[in-house]
Design a protein with these regions (language model features):
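Long, compositionally biased intrinsically disordered regions
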Residues: 175-189, 198-205, 231-234
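A structural detector for beta-sheet-dominated domains
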Residues: 13-17, 25, 30, 76, ...
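Short, exposed coil/turn segments at beta-strand boundaries within extracellular/luminal domains
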Residues: 79-83
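Tryptophan-paired
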Residues: 30-77, 208-267
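Generic marker of residues within folded, mature protein domains
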Residues: 4, 63, 78, 109, ...
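Compositionally biased low-complexity segments at domain edges in trafficked proteins
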Residues: 98-187, 271
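Sec-type signal peptide cleavage vicinity
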Residues: 1-43, 64-65, 70, 191-216
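Short beta-strand elements
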Residues: 84-109, 113, 118, 255-270
Length: 271
């Protein structure tokens, strides 16, 4: 089967940084041809679960679908009270290759693959696309949208409430979000990569077997002892969270959660 005709089981969803809510006005993951499935972003509501974290998901259309060719999106950034828009060509061959390659999912002890295409929206018109499956999430693209003004809104429009007076203030107040300065550029800083590895030092007889990491750029890794990247240096974004698991000599399993201070870890690596 030719690459452009290959189909996979996937759904689509949205992500936005915590305290920086976004809402899509119009959006579509457009198929390569008119015959291919195109996934639309309809009445999604406000997203701000955290960078890389998903805001629901839409499971519609056929069970398997061709990978989309492009992303068309227009959205409202509440903290800026601005609309952004853009049309972007997706790295389709790269996405297909990752879907085919998949990964070993330790949580189910077998090979798994990606199930969601996640579109991330951040202040300043930042657009990031990830693939998510199981406990693994990987960035595949970063785009730049531009500001736009939406006029001639029809009261019958399903998103008409976005244009009502005081709507932006209502959402920010309802979510308890203060109007502090927006740190433009932060989400590109999160994407900077450094060569590092996680390492857990244990006494003799203890067996370290699993590490699970959430990175500041929204990616997630799930490495186990037999994984080729386990314990090796690799260029990756900095971690916000890690989970380590190990066995004691009595075969009891232990684990520890590690939460990193953002300022401290970035200062340490940027020095």
């Amino acid at each position: 089967m030719q690459m452009e005709n290959k189909k996979f089981d996937w759904s689509h969803t949205v992500s936005a940084p915590e305290n920086y809510p976004m809402r899509i006005y119009r959006g579509e993951l457009k198929g390569l041809t008119d015959k291919d499935y195109s996934a639309t972003f309809g009445l999604w509501g406000v997203a701000n679960e955290g960078w890389g974290r998903i805001s629901g998901a839409v499971v519609v259309g056929p069970d398997t679908k061709a990978i989309p060719d492009s992303l068309l999106i227009t959205w409202l950034s509440f903290r800026e009270n601005k609309f952004y828009t853009g049309k972007f060509q997706l790295p389709r061959e790269k996405i297909i290759a990752l879907f085919e390659q998949g990964f070993y999912d330790y949580s189910i002890e077998k090979k798994n693959t990606y199930k969601k295409i996640v579109v991330g929206l951040a202040p300043g018109g930042v657009v990031v696309v990830w693939l998510l499956g199981g406990q693994v999430e990987i960035e595949v693209a970063r785009f730049q949208a531009h500001e736009t003004i939406i006029s001639n809104v029809n009261v019958r429009d399903s998103n008409y409430d976005m244009f009502e007076e005081d709507y932006v203030d209502f959402v920010l107040t309802n979510k308890g979000i203060e109007k502090t300065p927006v740190p433009f550029g932060l989400w590109d800083t999160y994407r900077e990569k450094y060569a590092w590895r996680p390492k857990l030092i244990l006494p003799s007889g203890y067996d370290f077997f699993l590490e699970w990491m959430t990175l500041y750029n929204g990616e997630k890794e799930n490495n186990f002892k037999e994984h080729p990247d386990f314990g090796t240096y690799k260029k990756r974004a900095l971690p916000s969270y890690m989970l380590f698991n190990w066995y004691a000599p009595d075969d009891r399993k232990y684990g520890v959660d590690v939460f990193f201070d953002e300022k401290e870890i970035f200062d340490a690596f940027q020095q």
